Swiss-Prot record:
Substrate binds at residues 46-48, 59, 88-89, 114-116, 119, 166. It comes from the Bacteria. Residues 31-196 form the SIS domain. One of its GO terms (cellular component) is cytoplasm. The lineage of its organism: Bacteria, Bacillati, Cyanobacteriota, Cyanophyceae, Oscillatoriophycideae. Keywords: Carbohydrate metabolism, Cytoplasm, Isomerase, Metal-binding, Zinc. Catalyzes the isomerization of sedoheptulose 7-phosphate in D-glycero-D-manno-heptose 7-phosphate. Its main location: cytoplasm. Belongs to the SIS family. GmhA subfamily. It catalyses: 2 D-sedoheptulose 7-phosphate = D-glycero-alpha-D-manno-heptose 7-phosphate + D-glycero-beta-D-manno-heptose 7-phosphate. Pathway: Carbohydrate biosynthesis; D-glycero-D-manno-heptose 7-phosphate biosynthesis; D-glycero-alpha-D-manno-heptose 7-phosphate and D-glycero-beta-D-manno-heptose 7-phosphate from sedoheptulose 7-phosphate: step 1/1. The reaction produces a racemic mixture of D-glycero-alpha-D-manno-heptose 7-phosphate and D-glycero-beta-D-manno-heptose 7-phosphate. This is Phosphoheptose isomerase. The keyword rRNA-binding does not apply.
Length: 196
């Protein structure tokens, strides 16, 4: 058991190196800035990454720690009717891109999550986002895979083992949620209103 814990901690320490932490801080800044400007965040992924997308949206719409107003974040994998209608009539590969086309405005952010970096529907969504003038965050293993050229704010790790990538992702987006919330609301005196 001790070996397993130490191995996981070593993986996390390697992942959160200075370069990755700088990228993380840049991402926090852009998410806070775009929310403050009235833009929204769209998030997409498959499987565990779809669950992560829902988790991120819930933290922003609800709250992470502070009692504050909701922030506009939408997970694109949550509407079964939309997902199945589009996939049945057209193709699953563009199921997120179609929603980006429907919901996004210039200045919004698309956050694509893919542990492999090669999820076709996430890639197509990122392509649509670039066409529409959105900012893009890419969160992936495998050094970014095919998301590299489509990502303005990369959060890529060199890890190839999916469970380890997912653990890194969880810590990463919790940090983003925590710090975006703090930047937007703690200065207004809400730091004393921490939810428990």
């Amino acid at each position: 058991m001790n070996y397993w814990i130490q191995h996981r901690l070593n993986c996390l320490e390697q992942a959160f190196n200075p370069k990755y932490c700088r990228a993380l801080e840049h991402t926090i800044g852009i998410v806070a800035r775009q929310f403050k400007a009235g833009n929204k965040l769209l998030i997409c992924g498959n499987g565990g990454s779809a669950a992560d997308a829902q988790h991120i949206a819930a933290e922003f719409v609800g709250r992470f720690q502070l009692h504050r107003k909701g922030l506009p974040a939408i997970a694109l994998g949550t509407n079964p009717a939309t997902l199945t209608a589009w996939s049945n009539d057209y193709e699953f590969e563009t199921v997120f891109a179609r929603q980006v086309e429907a919901f996004a405005q210039p200045g919004d952010i698309l956050w694509g999550i893919s542990t492999s970096g090669k999820s076709a529907n996430v890639i197509r969504a990122m392509e649509m986002a670039k066409d529409l003038g959105l900012l893009t965050i890419g969160m992936a293993g495998n050094n970014g895979g095919m998301l590299k050229d489509l990502t303005d704010y990369p959060l890529f790790v060199s890890e190839y083992h999916t469970p380890y990538i997912q653990e890194i992702h969880l810590i990463t987006y919790h940090r983003i949620c925590e710090q975006v919330e703090a930047q937007l609301f703690a200065k207004a005196g809400l730091e004393a209103q921490i939810a428990v």
